[in-house]
Amino acid sequence: MSRVSIKTRDDLPEALRPLWDKMTTYGAFENQAGVMAHRAPIFKHMWSLLVDLASDGIISKRHLELALVTVSLLNKCDYCVSHHAPKLAVQGVSEEGAARLVDYKDHPELDELDKLVVEYSIAVTNNWNRTRDEIFARLRAHFSEAQIVELTWRIALCGAFNRFNDILQLEVEQGVPHSEAAE
């Protein structure tokens, strides 16, 4: 049970209700949005950013979901794994494959670029202060600087969402298949 109450669309100021409607096209994140709705600036800016990035993203959906699931596995966030593993399945990585992303080096469902995205997600999450230039040279071979910025931001933001969701004990919405992130 969530540690704070979950607000609904009707609890938002009228001006933010269209953003709630757009948010629901991103996925079944009503519990997360409902908690953020306690502070209109948090709801407004986080969901505006996510909706904008979804409509104008420059990272492939596959690479984005690889990054988000990897970070969520590392941080053991059941909420985020439950929401993003199905999106990764749409991109061709099985449920079993998603569960073992952190063991990426010999992962049969990942190509070399996929493995680089997972490796970078681990670096941003666990080794941000010890990451060397070598990985950036490999990233630059495949991604523009704008893409590297977006990928890095999405990885870091996912870590913040993992902590937010877990500390407030957000439950996975009804109808979303529950996935365990714990090893």
Predicted regions and their residues:
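Hydrophobic alpha-helical segments
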Residues: 1-183
